[in-house]
A protein has these predicted regions:
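Histidine- and acidic-residue-rich, metal-dependent catalytic cores
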Residues: 1-181
């Protein structure tokens, strides 16, 4: 995949999000056999594939993005969706994850400003994992937070952005011994 050679940090982030999101999906959906966890994991791992079209000077900018750079960055979900459609790659659900992983429960996300039940459940799962990994990873523009600090920030400052049931279950993944199950 081009993402590996385009930006290794984004590649590592995609792997981390894939792991966290798959863990959350298994915790939420394990009793429902209609969900194909392997195909679902593909969508989680590919969620940022559209960033292979994002210039490195935007991805790795050491300071805040200006309005034009944010507009470029906000295109990556749509560009990833289009790439997978063009290649007829991944399932429809995986492509939806790629398109919707920056949508927020409160309607303040992008690219389509969906809210609540308008957002696919798989995208809601990916959103939580994506934010958690972004907070716990070193980036050119910020230091990393500990997992506890990240969960605290998500709870105190961002809670309205996440499906409340899914977020509570994500927090429980970090209770003693539960993440290894």
């Amino acid at each position: 995949i081009r993402l590996t050679s385009h930006d290794f940090t984004t590649y590592i982030h995609s792997v981390n999000v894939g792991i966290f999101a798959t863990g959350l999906a298994k915790a939420l959906l394990a009793t429902d056999s209609s969900h194909d966890m392997r195909e679902l994991a593909v969508g989680f791992f590919l969620h940022d594939i559209g960033k292979c079209a994002t210039p490195l000077n935007v991805l790795n900018k050491p300071g805040p993005l200006d309005d034009e750079e944010w507009n470029v960055m906000r295109r990556h979900p749509f560009e990833g969706f289009q790439l997978l459609e063009k290649l007829n790659a991944a399932t429809k659900e995986s492509r939806v994850i790629v398109m919707e992983h920056h949508e927020r429960h409160d309607g303040k996300g992008y690219p389509r400003r969906l809210k609540g039940d308008q957002i696919h459940i798989y995208s809601k799962i990916c959103c939580i994992a994506d934010v958690f990994d972004a907070l716990t990873s070193v980036r050119p523009y910020k230091e990393s937070k500990t997992p506890f600090q990240a969960l605290q920030i998500m709870k105190d400052q961002m809670r309205s952005e996440f499906d409340p049931v899914f977020f509570e279950r994500f927090v429980l993944l970090f209770s003693e011994g539960s993440y290894s199950k």
